[in-house]
């Protein structure tokens, strides 16, 4: 190779993250209700956005393609869900505080995960993580996911991928319903984010 020739890339790698949950707001708490949304939000969406915002701040571009169904995006922007998530995070921190201050013997064998000391250590870690999530949510997420996604898209860090309106198993749908789900989902993805 000459000194002027660009270095060849030995291969390419594409990272595509796809996310989907059904509409969970106002459908109860547990086991398949809002608790599922809030757990996913705290364990997946908050850390993912944290990492992507860090990469965007470093000037990283073309990091990944993110598939967000309209149902998920709508819930992450919905005022009812935003309030519910804030309450869920506060309750997470309270549950962690209870575990962190546990002094009652549990009857567990020494050295197991359910001893008071193990539960205290778990509670301390969870309390710290819940506090971080609460602070981050309060400062970054109070207006939903769309402003955060818009920031990442504008920075060129993330490419947003459209898809079906919901997430049915496409081959089993009536062709008219399949066409509707894809057409409306892509139209939704074409709408400008905050």
Language-model segment annotations:
Residues 1-194:
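Carbohydrate-active enzymes and regulators
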